[in-house]
Amino acid sequence: MASSGAGDRLFGFVQFDFAGTVGLPDGRYLAREPGGPPAPRQGETEDGEQSVLVVSTEGAPAPGRRRRRRPRQSKPEAEPDSLPLARVTAVRAFEPFAGGEEAARWLDAATEAEDTIDVLVDEGAALLNRALHAIAAASGDPYMHSRSPESAVAVRIGYGSGQQVADGEWTDARLVDVRGGTRRRRSDDLRPLERVAAVLGGRERIDTSETLILRARTDLDAGRIREAALQLRVGLEALLIELSGALNDPGHDEDMAVLQERRGEAGELANLALRGELEAEAERRTRELIELAERVLRRRRVLRG
C-alpha cells in the first residue's frame, strides 16, 4: 500500500478493537492467498497485494525485563490497571474502489444485512487468525490462541485512503454488532454456561471427539485443509466410539450410520493430506464430514439439555 497512488485510492476494511494485546507486534503485514505468489519483502513493490493486516496498540505495556520484579503488596482498594487497546485492521487491498461514490455504495450494501456483515467480519478475523497461527508456529508457543469477532470490544466496517487505513483510521465506517443475531441464537440454543458449570463441577466430562472436531473446524475455517483432514480422521474415530448409542433418536442413529459408512473416506482424506495440499473435491468432502460430525455433537448437546 506504499506503491504509487495507493494513498489516493480507497480501500474497504474490517476493524477490530481488542482489550489487551493480540500477540502480534505493531506493524503492517502483507498477505496473499495460500498457494499464490508470495507477498513482497520489505523494500520491494507492494503492487497487487491481496490483503493488508495493520496492528497498532495504544497503551502497550513496557517490554518485559530480563529479571522479574520482586512481589509487591497489593491493596484491595487500589484501582485496577488500565488495559491497552489493540486495533487490528484487515484491509481489502485486493479490491480498491474507483472513487468515493463506489466506496459509499459498497459500505451501504455491506452493512445492510446480517449475512453480509458476517461474511466480511469472518473474512477479517480469518486474516488475523492466519497471522496468529503463523507467529505461534514461528515462536513455538502453543498457547497463542485465535481471536473471535465476538471477543472484540468494537467491530467496524468501513473504507478509507491507503494512508488512513494504514494508520487505523477511515473516511467512513459503521460500528456493527457481531454478538447478536444468528450468532447469539446458535449459542443460546446450546446453553453453554450450564455445561461449563457441569464440567467444572465434575458432573460431566468433555469427550475427546468434541475437542478433536473443534480443532478440525478451527483448521477448516482458517484454510488449513490438510490439518483439518488429519484432525477429522482421529476425531471421527473417537466420535464413533464415544457417541455410539448415546441418544435414543432416529436422526442420531441415521447420522452415526452414515459416519460409520464413510469412516474409510476420512482415512483416505487424511492420507491424501499427508502427501500434499487437497484438491477442491477432497476439501468439499472434508468439510462435509466435519459438518456431519458437528451435527451429531450438536444434537447430543441440545437433546441432553
Which ranges hold each PLM region?
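Amphipathic, oligomerization/interface secondary-structure segments
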Residues: 181-305
